Amino acid sequence: MLFPPLRSLFLFTLLLSSVCFLQIKADHDDESDLGSDIKVDKRLKFENPKLRQAYIALQSWKKAIFSDPFNFTANWNGSDVCSYNGIYCAPSPSYPKTRVVAGIDLNHADMAGYLASELGLLSDLALFHINSNRFCGEVPLTFNRMKLLYELDLSNNRFVGKFPKVVLSLPSLKFLDLRYNEFEGKIPSKLFDRELDAIFLNHNRFRFGIPKNMGNSPVSALVLADNNLGGCIPGSIGQMGKTLNELILSNDNLTGCLPPQIGNLKKVTVFDITSNRLQGPLPSSVGNMKSLEELHVANNAFTGVIPPSICQLSNLENFTYSSNYFSGRPPICAASLLADIVVNGTMNCITGLARQRSDKQCSSLLARPVDCSKFGCYNIFSPPPPTFKMSPEVRTLPPPIYVYSSPPPPPSSKMSPTVRAYSPPPPPSSKMSPSVRAYSPPPPPYSKMSPSVRAYPPPPPPSPSPPPPYVYSSPPPPYVYSSPPPPPYVYSSPPPPPYVYSSPPPPYVYSSPPPPYVYSSPPPPPPSPPPPCPESSPPPPVVYYAPVTQSPPPPSPVYYPPVTQSPPPPSPVYYPPVTNSPPPPSPVYYPPVTYSPPPPSPVYYPQVTPSPPPPSPLYYPPVTPSPPPPSPVYYPPVTPSPPPPSPVYYPPVTPSPPPPSPVYYPSETQSPPPPTEYYYSPSQSPPPTKACKEGHPPQATPSYEPPPEYSYSSSPPPPSPTSYFPPMPSVSYDASPPPPPSYY
C-alpha cells in the first residue's frame, strides 16, 4: 500500500499527464475536425503545439491561393511560421511564455484564391487584414474559433453571398471592414447589438432597409453608403449620440423624411445622406448637432425653408444642399455671412439665387410639402441598446476629409504592417509597422462639388526603431481626432503599441490623412482577367487594435479601400503608376465615366489603331472630366455602384493591344473598355460565383478598384525592414487606391 504522500504524488502526476494528453489530443482533434490534408514532416521541429497548428493552417491556405504575382508566400516554408511574410507572432495572452500567431497582414498582395477552413486553427489571431486582393467565395464558419480577433478587414476583394454571420460570433471584434465586395441580402439586426467601434459595409449589394435597432450600436463610425438599402432612416438613430462621430448613408435609395431625432447626435462631425429619395423639410433639430462640420443633403427631394439654426453651427465647414426643392433660406444663411463655410445651394427653388430650378419644376409634385407621418418611419424606436462597457477613453473620430481631388499616391513596394484607413490600405513598408487605417475613398477630383476638404494630420514620421511588439490587452486608447489640412478623409489610429491581445484595443487615432473622400460614383472599372477568382484591386489595410507585445501589424483602417498593382489596362482613367506593376505604354488621361463615343463634334479617327476605326472613334481629351450633370450632385443615381477603380493598371480583359500614347481611341472595337456607365453597381452587376475553384479560367469581370481609404492610423509605417518582402504594392490607408470617379 502506498503511503499517503506517495499516493498524492502519484495521483497528481496521473492528473497532470491526463491534462497534457487531452491537450495534445484536442490539438489533433482540431486538425482532424477541420479536415486538413496537410501532412506535417516529422523532421520539422516546432516551438510549441500552437505554432504547429499555425503551420497547418498557413500551408492549407497557401494551397488555396491560385495566384501570388508578387511571390508573397514564397517563404511560407518550414517550421518557423513567425518568419513568414505577412505573419506576426506575439506572446499568448493566456501563456505569456508561448508564442502564437497574433496577426496576418496581406494587404495589397493582389493574391487570388479563397479562405481555407483550416484558418480556424489560428485561434489566437487578433487581426486579419487581407484587403485589396482577389480572394473570393465565402468566409469560412471556422472563423468562429478566433475568440481574440479584434480587427477583420476583408475589403476590396470578391467575397460573395449573404452577410458573413460568423463575424457575429467573434466576441472580441471591434473593427469590421467589408467594403467593396459582393455581399448581398439583409444587414442582420444583430450586427447593431454588438460592441463594435467601426462598421464599413459600403459598396456591396445589401438591400431590405436599415435595421430598426440601428441606434443600439455604440460605433463611432458607420458607413453603409452605395448599397441599395431602401426604406427609412430609423428613429432609433437618436440613441447613438454618445459615441457616433461619422455617419455616411449616401446613395442608398433611402425614402421618407429625415427623423428629428438626429438632433441628438451631438458628437457627429460628418453627416452625409446625399443621393437618396428623402423628402420633407430639414428638421430644425439639426441645429443641435453642435460638432457638425460636414452636412451633405444634396440630390434628394427636401422641401421647405432651410432652418436658420443650421447656419449658426459654430463648427460647420461645408453645407451642401443642392439639387433639392428648398423654397427659401433665412438671411443668416446668405453666402456673404458664411464666408468661412463652403455652401452649395444650386438647383433649388429659392428666389433670388442663381442657378435654381425652373418654374415648372418648382411647381411639380416633388416640390410640394409632404406629410411625414404617412411614411410611418421614425416613430418606431428600437428597445434600449444593450449596455456596453465603454472603455474609459473618449472615442472621437476625426471628421472625414472630403477631398475632391486627385487620387492618393501609388503604393510603395515594401510590405509594411497593415495600415488601416477607412480607405484603401496604405503601402506596406517594414515587416512590422503599426497598423494605420484611413477611411476615405479617393475618387478622382470632381468638378461640381464645393471643395470641402477635410484632412487629418498625417501620422508622425516613422521612427527608426522597429514597431512595438504585439501586446494582447489593455483597453483601446482614446480616439485622437484632429483635423489638419484638407486632403483626405482619414481616420488613422496610432499603430498598436505592443500588440495587446486583450479586450480593449489600442488607442484609436483617427488622424492620418487618407485619400480624399469624394462623393462620386467610380468610373466603370476596366475588365481584367483575374485568376480563378474575380479580380479586383486590393483595399486599404485597416488596423487599430490593442497594444501588443510584438511589433504591431500594419497601419490602420480607412474608409474606402484602395488599389493594387497590375498590368496597365485600357481603363478610361489615368491612375498613378503602381509600384511593381508594369508601366502602361504611356499615361493616358481618359475621360472619367464615358466609354462610349462622345458626341459627333470633335471626332478624330485614329489611323494608328490596328483595327479599322469604328464609325465614330473617340478622341479622349486629356484630363477633362465628363460634363457634370445638370445639377451638382455628389452621387450618381440612386443605384449603388461598385468600388471605384484603384490607381492600378489593370490588364485589359481582351487581348487587344494597349492604347498608344496619344490616345485617339476608336470606338468600342479596338479597346475593351465597356460602354458608357458600364460601371457595375452593387444592384446591377451579377455577383461573382460563391466559390472559386482552382483550374477554372478567370472570368472577365469588371475589376473593382479599391475603395478610398479612411486611415485609422496615427503613426507612420515603421522604417523599412532589414529583410525585404517580395515586391508588393501597398498603399497606406492614407494613400489609398485611386478614389472612385466622382459622380459629377
Swiss-Prot record:
Report where it is expressed, by tissue. Expressed in root hair cells (at protein level).
Q: What is the annotated signal peptide range for this record? A: 1-26
Compartments in which it is found: Secreted, Cell wall
Q: Name one GO molecular function term.
A: structural constituent of cell wall
Picking any one GO biological process from the record gives: trichoblast differentiation
Start-end of the LRR repeats? 122-145, 147-170, 171-194, 196-217, 219-240, 241-265, 266-289, 290-313, 315-336, 381-404
Among InterPro entries, the record links this protein to: Leu-rich_rpt, LRR_dom_sf, LRR_extensin-like_regulator, LRR_N_plant-typ
Q: Name one Pfam family in it.
A: LRRNT_2
Q: Glycans attached where?
A: 71, 77, 253, 318, 344
| Cellular component terms (Gene Ontology) | extracellular region; plant-type cell wall; plasmodesma
Give the span(s) annotated as Contains the Ser-Pro(4) repeats. Answer: 382-744
For bias type Pro residues, the affected ranges are: 704-729
Using the record for this protein, list the coiled-coil segments as residue ranges, or answer none: none
S-S pairs: none
Has UniProt tagged this entry with the keyword Cell membrane? no
Biased segments, Low complexity type = 430-439
Any idea what job this protein has? Answer: Modulates cell morphogenesis by regulating cell wall formation and assembly, and/or growth polarization. Together with LRX2, component of the extracellular mechanism regulating root hair morphogenesis and elongation.
Which named protein is this? Leucine-rich repeat extensin-like protein 1
Q: Which organism is it from?
A: Arabidopsis thaliana
Lineage at the top is: Eukaryota, Viridiplantae, Streptophyta, Embryophyta, Tracheophyta
Q: Which gene encodes it?
A: LRX1
